[in-house]
């Protein structure tokens, strides 16, 4: 298991929830059908990702982020009970990966975690995965969006409360 760190103001229950949702995202994206590869064209497994992961959970009203074997989640909106998940301008209008109202704050938290796990997977594995190599590999580019789209479609958007058009 990788390293999990929580800020002093984060409860054990909140830490465990973020850990569970992070694992859920990783388990989905390493499924055989998505063909995410690691070094030497080896199919990625849960252990490959989880054992290297540094997961940090904080509650400071700051940004969350994901990168090289690293995911940092700020749970402030979750703790406030917010169910609306905002996205960056580049993707906010996308019907699958855009901004969305969810039924519960836990669902909105899952959307946040999926966003950051997508960054971590993209950063570490796009170079090894043929279907990710060809696109725009910027942080919110086409390749990252492909990963994020899988996570949102398969895990997150199943509990959305669609916004009125």
Language-model region placement:
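Walker B catalytic acidic pair
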Residues: 116
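Active-site-proximal or metal-binding-adjacent scaffold patches in catalytic folds
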Residues: 1-111, 120-165
């Amino acid at each position: 298991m990788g390293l999990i760190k929580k800020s002093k103001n984060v409860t054990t229950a909140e830490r465990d929830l973020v850990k569970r949702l992070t694992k859920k995202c990783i388990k989905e994206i390493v499924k055989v059908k998505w063909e995410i590869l690691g070094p030497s064209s080896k199919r990625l497994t849960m252990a490959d990702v989880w054992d290297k992961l540094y997961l940090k959970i904080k509650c400071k009203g700051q940004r969350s982020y994901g990168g090289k074997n690293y995911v940092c989640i700020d749970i402030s909106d979750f703790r406030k009970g917010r169910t609306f998940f905002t996205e960056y301008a580049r993707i906010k209008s996308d019907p699958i990966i855009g901004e969305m109202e969810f039924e519960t704050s836990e669902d909105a938290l899952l959307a946040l975690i999926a966003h950051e796990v997508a960054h971590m997977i993209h950063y570490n594995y796009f170079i090894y995965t043929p279907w990710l190599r060809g696109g725009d590999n910027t942080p919110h580019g086409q390749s990252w969006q492909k990963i994020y789209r899988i996570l949102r479609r398969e895990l997150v958007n199943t509990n959305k409360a669609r916004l009125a058009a």
